[in-house]
From Swiss-Prot:
Lineage summary: Bacteria, Bacillati, Mycoplasmatota, Mycoplasmoidales, Metamycoplasmataceae
Record keywords: Ribonucleoprotein, Ribosomal protein, RNA-binding, rRNA-binding
Subunit-level organization: Part of the 50S ribosomal subunit. Forms a bridge to the 30S subunit in the 70S ribosome.
Name of protein: Large ribosomal subunit protein uL2
InterPro entries: NA-bd_OB-fold, Rib_uL2_dom2, Ribosomal_uL2, Ribosomal_uL2_bac/org-type, Ribosomal_uL2_C, Ribosomal_uL2_CS, Ribosomal_uL2_dom3, Ribosomal_uL2_RNA-bd_dom
Keyword match Metal-binding: no
Entry GO terms, CC: large ribosomal subunit
Any one Gene Ontology molecular-function term assigned to this protein's record: transferase activity
Pfam family of the protein (one): Ribosomal_L2_C
Keyword Ribonucleoprotein set for record: yes
Organism name: Metamycoplasma arthritidis (strain 158L3-1) (Mycoplasma arthritidis)
Superkingdom, taxonomy of origin: Bacteria
Amino acid sequence: MAIKKFKAYTNGRRNMSSLDYQANLSGHRPEKSLLVALPTHSGRNNQGKITTRHHGGRLKRFYRLVDFKRNKDDILATVKTIEYDPNRSANISLVVYADGEKRYIISPKGLKVGQKIISGEQVDIQIGNSLPLKNIPEGTYVHNIEMQPKQGGVIARSAGSSAQILGKDETGRYIILRLKSGEVRKILALCRATVGEVGNEEHSLVNIGKAGRNRLRGIRPTVRGSAMNPNDHPHGGGEGHQPIGRKSPMTPWGKKALGVKTRKTKKASNQFIIRRRKESK
């Protein structure tokens, strides 16, 4: 999808960019039968207390029911539209099956309106088709990958993401995948995946440009701890601009921040990770 840049006729428009939706998406309204109401919580729990900071004030939207399981086997489906989804970075495609049922799926890179796709145990290796990992050849890029059979895809669903199949392990029960993060892990061979990479890969290149666009997305301002009072944050207080006065940065609740590993050391799925993801610098 092409990126559209704006002229700097105001400071907010300077360096702002956006995806060119009109040139790349079908100009259709969403399928009503696949929409559900999406209430806003503004980061509050059922007691009204803030549990997630910096959330609230987004535009009203509907949730699109996306088919992550792809369990309608051996029935041809035709891609009717490619649409924008406000709830995820990837685009979605409306597919109509031969029996008339309509479903939304994650739109892979290269999928066109009018194209035929299918799910099943033994289907062709082409973009948009869904089948078990054991039947996909080595070197193929896949997305919407299950971690447990019949669970529905949970890995590689965001814009531009994918995983590459490296082969089978010595037992044949597991398929070895390399994720975009660099992590190499084993997944049960019975789990399903969809062939191809997720589309809309330019999503990460968009420059928001001004705070108002983030407010429409439901992202509220983030105040620095050093700008607060000492009773509000461990970094707060002091006369003028002062250092934080601690050996390492802290969270608002006094825990160490930055560089602290947050993954549980005894997590059950650790046994399936062959190589950890690359450490960010």
